[in-house]
A protein has these predicted regions:
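Gram-negative and organellar
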Residues: 19-38, 42, 51-662
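Positively charged n-region of N-terminal signal peptides that target proteins for export
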Residues: 1-5
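Bacterial N-terminal signal peptides
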Residues: 6-15
């Protein structure tokens, strides 16, 4: 259930940024055509100002989803320098744009430098503050926390970018650093839980080199890369700073705890692609191979003084993970009305090596050992699609999809001196057909209807597609100043595996449109509703007793609405008003434990998750002169959970700034 709540919180957080934050301002200062300096034309705009925020309610929830604070910022900047005749001395184009510099939680910079026919260099840099207070654990009182920074950057150099012979070189890196808190239960299922502190340190780097050329009219592109990953995060007993105080004194003290779990890996890879166009025939193909190699060790040692007890857990492993993929796509267009396309793809991944797990308990004098040796997955798929435009009024399409997957694994288990091997193999075939029709009864009006039905002989997981069908429809009306579109999609899936069963249905309805009666006035709005209902069989142990024949149920009804109005007064004042609201109505119950079905009350309380988020905003931008604009904006963030009121928040944010051009 925590995964479902986390997924819903991700949707809410994504919606926060689906509506562009009120700052920076979209309007730029300066002359649109720029200023000429010697052989270059320069267009620049910089926006600097003060951002403010006040938060009521759960500050941790606000930080995990919005996180804007107070202070002076370089909210945004844009610089573009172009040579006037395409023959600059050192470069012909230079562009630089930034956002949020000066301690915003989301900072970025993008740069390009190009010299025609000689080189092109692209750079991007981002820094995100990642704050995760573990709000979905312990009813919001969990002892898990991450307060880290993610830094990412990419560098790409292309030599001879306009020629038939190109050379590529690149470098990328990302890192995550900062403090983290977690917890661990020691000395049995009834043992105490202890807080842990971790200094998170994860680094990923990639180096790449490639080339593109043409031979016999075929364009060939290849790339060779090397990836390196290191995670040196460990854990010690937390002495202070635990997010929530431990409930009550611990009956058995923990005198020491130390965990070391380095995880290092490399992944050299090759990528190749070909593209060919022969008039009626179009061909493209791609092939990738990566030879991942990884090694890890987890060494946990805990010692209790009362009663005296020592527990050691050691997990180690090393292995190779070669992955090969390939696809070949063919398209045939014998007439302007008919297109036939076929795609064949192959995916093969193998995990080879040993994973060793051992646990020793000084009180029970027991040792458990588990080996994991091999996992292989091979998938072959083929898709055939046909599109035919009968007339300007209507056309139709049809498709057939087939895939076959083979999964093999090998495990070895040692317990009390006895060793057993557990090989397993599974194969399944997925077949589906799709048909649709396109109608244009009137030039401004278009209609698209389609349906897909599929069956899987042996689904790999309970939630995978078994016997399913999908229905979709879309209608759009487009005029010169007005556009209105509506869509509907319904998915139904029934799956039964050897141990349990699973069924799901979802329906999505949406309508959106925009109207621009005048060049200075625009209205944009939309609404969508997503209904999801899932039910799956579950089996579990409670107090060493097996419970079966029960169901896990989840219901969701998410309504989303957005609207925006832009109005310009005398080409000097820009006004924008916007509103976004996302609400999951759940199943309408008044209390968390008023569930459905025969599952225990604990399960019924997590069958639905009613939550609401809204964010109105207003922004004003006034042109003072050709090189200066004054901006101000306000944005409200409101979030509430119906069954956990302590996790709601209300935030008033805003800014005032000056946009200027040199």
């Amino acid at each position: 259930m925590a995964m479902r709540i986390a997924a819903l919180l991700f949707v809410i957080a994504s919606t926060v940024f689906a509506q562009v934050p009120v700052a920076p301002s979209p309007g730029l200062a300066g002359e649109p055509l720029g200023t000429n300096v010697q052989n270059y034309n320069i267009v620049d705009s910089f926006e600097t100002g003060y951002r403010f925020s006040t938060v009521g309610g759960s500050f941790e929830q606000y930080r995990s989803s919005v996180n804007f604070g107070d202070g002076i910022r370089l909210l945004g900047s844009s610089l573009m320098v172009n040579s006037k005749n395409g023959h600059g001395r050192l470069f012909d184009q230079f562009t630089l744009s930034t956002q949020g510099l000066g301690n915003d939680p989301y900072e970025s910079a993008v740069m390009r430098v190009e010299k025609n026919r000689l080189y092109r260099y692209d750079m991007s840099w981002r820094r995100n503050d990642y704050f995760n207070p573990g709000l979905v654990t312990g009813g919001g009182d969990g002892q898990h926390l991450l307060d880290t920074q993610n830094r990412m950057q990419d560098h790409n150099l292309t030599l001879f970018p306009q020629s038939n012979l190109k050379v590529f070189a690149g470098f990328s890196t990302s890192s995550q650093t900062g403090p983290g808190y977690s917890s661990i239960q020691l000395f049995g299922a009834t043992g105490n839980t202890f807080p842990l502190f971790s200094n998170v340190h994860r680094v990923w780097r990639e180096y790449r080199l490639g080339n593109e050329f043409r031979v016999f009219g075929i364009r060939v592109n290849w790339m060779h890369g090397w990836e390196d990953f290191k995670d040196d995060t460990g854990a010690t007993l937390a002495a202070a700073g635990v997010p929530v105080a431990m409930p009550g004194p611990l009956p058995a003290g923990l005198s020491s705890f130390q965990a070391s779990d380095p995880n290092h890996g490399t992944n050299p890879y090759w990528r190749a692609a070909i593209f060919a166009d022969r008039g009626l025939f179009h061909l493209n193909g791609r092939f990738t191979y990566s030879g991942g190699r990884n090694a890890f060790v987890v060494d946990e040692r805990s010692q209790a003084s009362s009663p005296a007890r020592v527990q050691n857990v050691i997990t180690s492993g090393n292995g190779d993970r070669p992955v090969a993929t390939g696809n070949l796509n063919l398209s045939f267009t014998p007439t302007s009305k008919l297109t036939v396309a076929n795609s064949t793809s192959v995916y093969n991944v193998r995990t080879l090596g040993n994973s060793y797990f051992a646990e020793f308990d000084s009180q029970t004098q027991a040792t458990t050992v588990l080996f994991y040796r091999y996992l292989g997955i091979r998938t072959v798929a083929n898709d055939t699609n046909l599109n035919y435009q009968v007339s300007h009024l209507w056309g139709f399409m049809g498709a057939y999809h087939y895939s076959e997957r083979l999964i093999t694994s090998q495990q070895q288990f040692t317990f009390a001196g006895a060793t057993s091997s557990n090989p397993a193999e599974q194969s399944n075939q997925l077949r589906s057909g799709e048909a649709g029709v396109r109608l244009t009864p009137w030039k401004p009006l278009s209609v698209l209807l389609s349906a897909e039905i599929g069956t899987n002989s042996h689904p790999f997981t309970p939630i995978a597609g078994g016997d399913y069908h999908t229905l979709t429809g879309r209608v759009q009306y487009r005029a010169k100043t007005f556009r209105l579109a509506a869509a509907v999609k319904a998915d139904y899936n029934a799956n039964s595996v050897s141990l349990t069963s699973y069924a799901a249905q979802s329906r999505t309805y949406s309508v959106n449109g925009n109207w621009t009666p005048l060049s200075r006035f625009t209205i944009d709005a939309g609404f969508s509703r997503a209904h999801t209902y899932t039910i799956g069989g579950i089996a579990y142990f409670l107090d060493q007793q097996l419970f079966q024949g029960q169901s896990s149920i989840y219901l969701s009804n998410i309504n989303s609405i957005y609207a925006g109005v832009r109005y310009t007064i005398r080409s000097r004042i820009d006004l924008y008003l916007g509103y976004t609201r996302v609400q999951d109505l759940g199943d309408g119950r008044a209390a968390a434990n008023a569930g459905v079905g025969s599952a225990p009350a604990l399960f019924q309380a997590v069958q639905t998750f009613p939550v609401a988020f809204q964010s109105p905003m207003a922004r004003l931008s006034v042109k003072v002169n050709d090189k200066l604009r004054w901006n101000a904006g306000y944005q409200y963030y409101g979030y509430q959970q119906d069954f956990t009121s302590l996790l709601g928040y209300r935030a008033n944010t805003g800014y005032t700034s000056l946009s200027f051009s040199f």
